[in-house]
């Protein structure tokens, strides 16, 4: 099936203003297996953060758009849930193939609307998404959906209509991380991408369509969180809501879903610490921390934004971090030599700049590298300077709040116990790292992190392991079996027993009369 989507040249560099054509205009939403006109009166401008020029306009979706998408999903759900798992996974393998075929198109769109450097968009944004999608499908293919427990048959079945609300920072990866498990579980999905980055989602709708999923199983609607998102989350026919976003957005979604007692899964923010113990290889640990902290220009929930080092080695660590940052190139994301692109929007540029200014003026922190404003030579685009603060008070604003930019806060500590208090001393609990010359010591310390993920001496991400946070970093888990189970309900079917067995449960008689067990089963 061929679906009209963003033209392949949408990610090309902007022309000179005097000759620039009007940006593409899209007026439709993907509902019930086809593009249908939105009834939105207003529009959203999708902006290239590197040039500040418009890329396209899309509808500011309405509550009516959300309602139509949810009803299409609800109509498709029974048939999709009843489809055997082997058939669902076979169709979803076509989706994985479609992601691979369109990898360069996805990368171009992500570079254009997110500002991710082109080689990183292809290798990481898209490459990880393809790998994650494949892993999700194979997890479902090997999952045990039914098992006997004593005289009960325990069945795990699709939870219903799932609303998947995804962010702008690593949009394709975080979308497939939700949608593929939901679809593999047998749920019908309504996807709401961020209004900042909807263009890749149009291409994703095409990929699903070409895989021949039944109409209504996948729907995609674009709009703001306050209008379309709120209508989607609160819709009475939505059974499960899965959101990745800010902690503020998570609170709003929880409140909106409370009246319907919906299942809510939240992957939220983080103020993640990289803890370098006193026996660790400091240069290696600092280099790894800086590299991770700068990925996606610091716009990831997993970012190690706090670097904890022994007090007597802080100056050395700061110098190592400063030199490491100097080795990264900030600039045009379409240039293969670029490591750091712009922030995603003018609002993000203003927010990060304000944090940097506050960090330099309060709490006794020392600005060791970078600072507010654009890097030298860049006058257009939402570019910021990679920044290092030293002597950061763990209780200060920059020590506590998620900045979501390329800002590293170095915090000295005096002993292991103090270091762990600092690590665990925020409202977040998503990710962390610990570095030591002794793997056993590093693992022991990692067990004391109040976080959902900890990298021990550079251990890499594992898509089979649960992903999620403690405290205000979220509720629930994604990835692996846990990610699939987020979209499943569990049913226990008590099967008839041999005569004379003891009855346990809300019964008046100790044992059922002859034939009662068989009769109850026939009548039920």
Annotate each predicted stretch with a short phrase.
Residues 2-50, 521:
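Hydrophobic face of amphipathic alpha-helices that form TPR/SEL1-like repeat modules
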Residues 33, 52, 88, 110, ...:
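Residue-level signal for inorganic ion chemistry
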Residues 51-57, 238, 275, 329, ...:
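Conserved C-terminal structural/oligomerization subdomain of aldehyde/semialdehyde dehydrogenase
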Residues 54-61, 76-82, 164, 274-277, ...:
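Short, well-ordered beta-strand elements within core beta-sheets of diverse protein domains
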Residues 70-71, 89, 93-105, 116-142:
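Long amphipathic alpha-helix in the N-terminal Rossmann-like dinucleotide-binding domain
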Residues 94, 149-152, 370-377:
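Short, solvent-exposed loop/turn elements at beta->coil junctions and helix N-caps
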Residues 100, 145-284, 413:
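Rossmann-like NAD(P) dinucleotide-binding subdomain of oxidoreductase/dehydrogenase enzymes
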Residues 248-393, 456, 502-503, 508-513, ...:
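ALDH superfamily catalytic-core signature
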């Amino acid at each position: 099936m061929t679906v009209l989507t963003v033209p392949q040249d949408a990610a090309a560099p902007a022309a000179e203003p005097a000759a620039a054509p009007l940006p593409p205009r899209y007026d439709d939403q993907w509902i019930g297996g086809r593009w249908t006109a939105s009834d939105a009166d207003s529009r959203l401008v999708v902006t290239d953060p590197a040039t500040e020029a418009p890329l396209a306009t899309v509808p500011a979706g309405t509550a009516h758009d959300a309602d139509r998408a949810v009803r299409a999903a609800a109509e498709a759900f029974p048939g999709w849930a009843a489809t055997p798992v082997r058939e669902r996974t076979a169709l979803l393998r076509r989706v994985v193939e479609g992601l691979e075929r369109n990898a360069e198109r996805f990368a171009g769109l992500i570079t254009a609307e997110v500002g991710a450097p082109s080689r990183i968009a292809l290798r990481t944004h898209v490459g990880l998404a393809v790998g994650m999608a494949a892993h999700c499908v194979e997890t479902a293919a090997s999952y045990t959906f039914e098992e006997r427990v004593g005289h009960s048959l325990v069945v795990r079945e699709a939870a219903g209509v799932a609303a998947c609300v995804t962010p702008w920072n690593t949009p394709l990866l975080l979308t497939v991380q939700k949608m593929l498990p939901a679809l593999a579980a047998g749920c019908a999905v309504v996807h709401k991408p961020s209004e900042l980055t909807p263009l890749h989602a149009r291409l994703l709708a095409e990929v699903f369509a070409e895989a021949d999923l039944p109409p209504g199983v996948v729907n995609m609607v674009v709009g703001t969180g306050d209008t379309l998102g709120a209508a989607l989350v609160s819709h009475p026919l939505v059974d499960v809501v899965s959101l990745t976003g800010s902690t503020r957005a998570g609170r709003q979604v929880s409140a909106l879903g409370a009246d319907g007692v919906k299942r809510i899964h939240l992957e939220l923010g983080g103020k993640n610490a990289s803890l370098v113990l006193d026996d660790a290889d400091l240069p290696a640990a600092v280099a790894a921390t800086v590299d991770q902290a700068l990925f996606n220009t610091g716009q990831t929930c997993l970012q190690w934004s706090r670097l904890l080092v022994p007090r007597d080695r802080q100056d050395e660590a700061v110098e190592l971090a400063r030199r490491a940052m100097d080795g990264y190139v900030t600039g045009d994301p379409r240039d293969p030599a670029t490591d750091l692109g712009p922030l995603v929007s003018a609002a993000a540029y203003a927010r990060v700049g304000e944090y940097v200014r506050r960090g330099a003026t309060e709490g006794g922190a020392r600005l060791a590298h970078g600072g507010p404003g654009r890097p030298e030579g860049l006058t257009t685009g939402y570019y910021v300077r990679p920044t290092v603060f030293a002597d950061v008070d763990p209780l200060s604003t920059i020590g506590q709040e998620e900045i979501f930019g390329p800002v590293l806060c170095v915090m000295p500590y005096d002993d292991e116990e103090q270091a762990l208090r600092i690590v665990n001393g925020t409202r977040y609990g998503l990710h962390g790292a610990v570095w030591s010359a002794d793997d056993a010591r590093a693992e022991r310390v990692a067990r004391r992190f109040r976080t959902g993920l900890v990298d021990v001496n550079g251990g890499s991400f594992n898509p089979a392991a649960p992903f999620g946070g403690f405290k205000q970093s979220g509720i629930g888990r994604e990835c692996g079996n846990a990610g699939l189970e987020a979209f499943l309900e569990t049913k226990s079917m008590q099967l008839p027993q041999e005569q004379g067995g003891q009855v346990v449960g809300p019964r008046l008689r100790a044992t059922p009369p002859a034939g009662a067990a068989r009769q109850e089963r026939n009548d039920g």
